[in-house]
Amino acid sequence: MNDPLSRRDAVKILGLAGASMMAPGDLPARIVASATSDSMPADILPLTSTSEVFTPPRGRSYNTFSFDFPEPSVEFDGFRFGFLVFTGENAYALDPALMRAVTTSDSMHLMCNGFTWAGGQEKSPGILTAIFKKAGNSITWDATVDMPHPVKSVTTIIRGFPRGRVGFGGPGGGTPNDNEILTGYPFSGGDLFGGNTADGMGTPLAIVTATDNSCVSISSLDTMVCTKRFFFQPGEQGYRVEAIAEAPGWNQQKQWLSPSWRILRTATADAAVQAHYEHLDRTYHLQKWDVRTDVPAWMRQVALVTTMHGQHFTGFIFNDYAKQLKILRWMATQMPAERVLIFLAAWDGRYYWDYPNYKVSDRMGGEVGFRKLIDEGHKLGFRMMPMYGTNSANRKQPMFKQVQDAVVNKVDGDVVDLNWVDWDNDRHQEGWAAYMNLGVDSWRNWMVGRIDEMITRYGVDAYFLDIVGGHINSRNGDMHEGTRRLVMDLRAKHPNVPCVGEMAYDALVEFIPMFHVGLGRLGQYSKNFQHLSSPAPGRGSSGVHESGFGRFNPETLSLSPGAIPTLQVVDDTFSKHRDVMAAIIQKAKERAGI
C-alpha cells in the first residue's frame, strides 16, 4: 500500500504544497477509481467510546471522555473500524450522516465528507477517505484526511481483537487482566511523565495471544520514524484498540496521508514478529551484525567494556585522568588490551552541567592529562570512547544562544525540558537543561563539530551518544533524520570511527551498530553492553548516573548473559575491589575464549 515515493519525501512535498495539494473533489476519486462491479454498501454502525468496554474501568485506566463520544464504524473481515482525527484545537469524529462505505470480497473503501465535534453536538468541515485491503490472513489500510486546521494525529479504532496476553514488539507474558494498556513508539511516544504516560516499545508492533495460543497482531507499516501509540481497552468479549499515528510535527499539514497499518492473524506470535521484521528489513535496509559494513574489525573483537566514571554533576571526581591511566596499566596485565573498549563517562567536567561544551576538564587533569590518557591507552592497545549528550544543553552555558532554536517543541507545541533528574539532591528536579533536536541545523552542526574535534585532535576510536533513542516528534525538525545525518556526516569524515548509542528503536540500528541497553530482537543487527548505571563492585555505586546505589551481585558479578561483559569503575573500585575487577575480567575472557 506504499507508493514508490517514500513517505519522508511525500511529507516534504505535502508540507510545501499545503492543503491545496488535494481539492475536496479529488478525494472521492480514490474510491470511484477502484470500485468494482461486486461492490456492496456497508452499514454504518452507531458505536461510541463506551461501546463494548468496561464502564467504569475495572483495572488500571487512562484519561477518557466522561460521555459517549461518537465512533461510527464499519465492519470488514470480522473487525469494526472507525476513525478519530485530532488537530491542535480539538478532537473530531466522523459524521455518520456523511459517511459511506463500499465493500468487495477483498477490499473496503470508506468516505466521509464531514466531521462532528463536542461529542457530536457540532459539525465541522473536513474529509476522510480510507482504503482497506484483505490478502490472505492480513488486512492493511491507510487514510487520507483534509482538515481546516493542521492535523496532529489520526486514530483508527478497531473492535474485534480477542482478550488475551498483550505484548509489544513480541509476545506478551503473564495472566490477562482488566487493565487498560497504553504503549508508545519510540521513547514512550514522547510523553514521559505524569499519570497518563505510555510504556515504551522499540518497534510499533502489538500482539494479542488468545487462550488457544492463536495470535492477532497490529503493526505500523510506516516507512519513516514518527510517533505511534497503541491503546488497548478491555471489555467482556474483546479489546477496543486505538492505533494512533502522529503527523510529522515539523510540517503542520492540513492534508495528510497517514501511514499504513496491518492486522495479521497467525498461529504463533513468532510468525507475527517475523512478518513485522521483514517489513523493517526492507524499509530501513537493516543488516545482520555479521555482515554489517559499518563495524570496524576491532569492534567485532570487543570482549569487555569498561566504564570509567569521571566527574559527577556536583563536581565529585570518581577517577581523574591520571587514575584512569593507572587502572588501564593494571588492566593490560590481566587481558589483551586490544579486546577492551574504554567508555569515558563524564570525561568533560561536571556531568550534564557542562553539556554541551565538551572540553577536557582542568580539574581532572587538563589537556596534558587527557592526552596522556588517550595516547598511552592506545599504546597499551585499548580502544577509547568519550560520551556526548545527544539532546542535552544547559541553558546557563554561554554558548546556548547559538543553539537555542533547536529546543524541542512537541507536536502540540509543548516545549520539552530535560528536567526529570534531581542532580543536587534538594528533592526537586532540576530545570536548567533543554531537550535538543538534531533535526535543527544549529544543534546538529554544533555536535558534529565537537565530536569531530575530539576524533581529529585525540584520535579516539568511537563516540557515544547518550539518550540517542529519545526520539520526540518535534515541530522544529525531523529528529530521526537529523540523527542519521549526524552519524553519516561523521562517518564521511572518519569512516573507521563508529557511533555507539543509548536506547534503541528499530530504525536506529540501521546506522548505529552498538548500544548500552538490552536490544531484544534488535540484537540480531547490533550488539550491546551494560548501562553505565549498573552497580559497580562493592556498594553498587551508579557512578555519574543519578540512581545512586544498586545491589552488586557477587555470585553473578552483575553480568548480563546477553550483553558484552561490562566493568563499572567508580571511586573505590580499583582500591578496594580489585579482586572483583579481576574476576569480571576473567569471566569476559572465558566468554570470548581468550
What are the functions of these language-model segments?
Residues 41-341, 376, 383-384:
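Carbohydrate-recognition beta-sandwich/jelly-roll modules
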Residues 338-342, 381-385, 461-463, 496-498, ...:
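Beta-sheet entry/capping signal
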Residues 2-3, 9-31:
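N-terminal export signals
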Residues 304-376, 380-448, 458:
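Aromatic-lined carbohydrate-binding/catalytic grooves of carbohydrate-active enzymes
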Residues 348-354, 391-396, 470-474, 506-510, ...:
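Flexible loop/turn segments at secondary-structure boundaries
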Residues 435-509:
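Active-site neighborhood of glycoside hydrolase catalytic domains
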Residues 14, 31, 143-145, 155-158, ...:
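Glycine-rich, histidine-containing beta strand-loop boundary motifs that form or position
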